[in-house]
């Protein structure tokens, strides 16, 4: 299910209780696709069979300026944050690729709330661009996907949720009983 949502959506949310297997789900998929990509015939038949690299971060662990971009008040220059650096490097790498030979998954492990996710809405819509405070844009390459690993969507805006593919980890399906 995760693979199919990733094929049609740049951003995907894996939603479920702590310990239900969200991390294991994408790790198994990543390993499987990477292993299948070692088979030249398979790799030629579908560009999803390739090496997958991932970067994982907790968006609530750093200030928003460290995620996207920050202006140095002394030099008056802008510096890319973590997300902007990763996306800018991917954008540059896409310029050298003629065919997708590897994929990048940027995984946000933490709550999805308006304090940091609203800046991702243009990334998640059809334009696939990160708009930064210095008025620059980063075009998100086709080989990149975003995964949001969340416990729930209580504080996520409808605008963000509607732009993402959803994979819900049903507790009963994995043998867990939710609290009443």
Predicted regions and their residues:
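Conformational switch/transducer regions in large eukaryotic molecular machines and scaffolds
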Residues: 1-180
């Amino acid at each position: 299910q995760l693979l199919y949502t990733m094929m049609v959506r740049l951003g995907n949310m894996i939603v479920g209780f702590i310990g239900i297997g969200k991390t294991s789900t994408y790790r198994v998929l990543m390993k499987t696709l990477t292993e299948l990509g070692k088979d030249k015939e398979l790799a030629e038949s579908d560009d999803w069979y390739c090496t997958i690299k991932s970067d994982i971060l907790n968006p609530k662990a750093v200030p928003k300026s460290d995620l996207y971009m920050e202006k140095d008040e002394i030099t008056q220059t802008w510096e890319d944050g973590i997300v902007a650096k990763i996306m800018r490097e991917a954008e540059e790498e896409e310029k050298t690729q003629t065919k997708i030979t590897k994929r990048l998954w940027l995984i946000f492990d933490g709550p999805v709330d308006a304090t940091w996710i609203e800046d991702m809405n243009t990334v998640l819509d059809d334009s696939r661009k990160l708009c930064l405070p210095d008025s620059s844009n980063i075009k998100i390459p086709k080989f990149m996907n975003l995964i949001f690993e969340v416990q729930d969507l209580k504080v996520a805006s409808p605008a963000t949720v509607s732009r993402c593919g959803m994979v819900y980890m049903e507790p009963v399906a994995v043998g867990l009983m939710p609290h009443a």
